[in-house]
Amino acid sequence: STSRRQRQMCIRDSKMVEVRMILADCGYEIVSMKEAGIDIDIVEDGKTFEENAIIKATAISKTKEAEGCVVLADDSGLEVDYMDGAPGIYSARWQGEDTPYSIKNQMIIDALADAKEEERTARFVCAIAAAFPDGTVTTRRGVIEGMIAHQPAGEHGFGYDPIFFLPEYGKTTAELAPEDKNKISHRGRALEKIREVL
C-alpha cells in the first residue's frame, strides 16, 4: 500500500487554483510550497521552458519538506512571433519583474504597431516537470495558439491574458470564464498530459 506521504504532491503556489481544478481526481493530496513550508530561492537559468521547469521541480524535491512527494513545477510564457519569440522564457522578468503587466501588455501592443494582421501570431507555452521520489523527472508541454489583440480586454486571468486573443472564441483569454480557460489553456493542456504519468 502507498503511504499518505507518497500520495502527496508538492506544487509551486502561483497557479494552485488551476492545478487543483484540473488534478482534483488524480489520487494525490495537492499541497502548495507555502502549505508545505518550503521557502527557497531558485535561479531559473535554463534556456527552455522545460529546463526551467526541471530546475524548479528538482530543487524543490531536494528539500526536507518535499521528501517522498511528487513535485510538480511549471515554466510558462508568451511567445510573440513578430518579436522573434519574445518575451518567451523571460515572460515574468521581461521589462523587470516589478513592471505591472498592464504596462508590459501595452509595450507588446506598441511593438506590433506596424505588424500586419497575419503577423500578430503568438502562443502561450507551458512546460510542467514532475520530479518523483526515486529521482526520475519527466516533462510535458502544453501550447495554445492565438494572436496579439490590438487592445487589452477582459477581467479574468492574469499576466498577458488581456492581450492574448483566441480567434475561434472571438475573445481574449482574460474574457473567458476561468473554468472555460482551464479547459483550453496551455497549463491545462500540460497538466492533462502530466496526469498520464502520475
Whereabouts are the PLM-identified features?
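Single conserved hydrophobic/aromatic residue that forms the stacking wall/gate
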Residues: S1-R7, I11
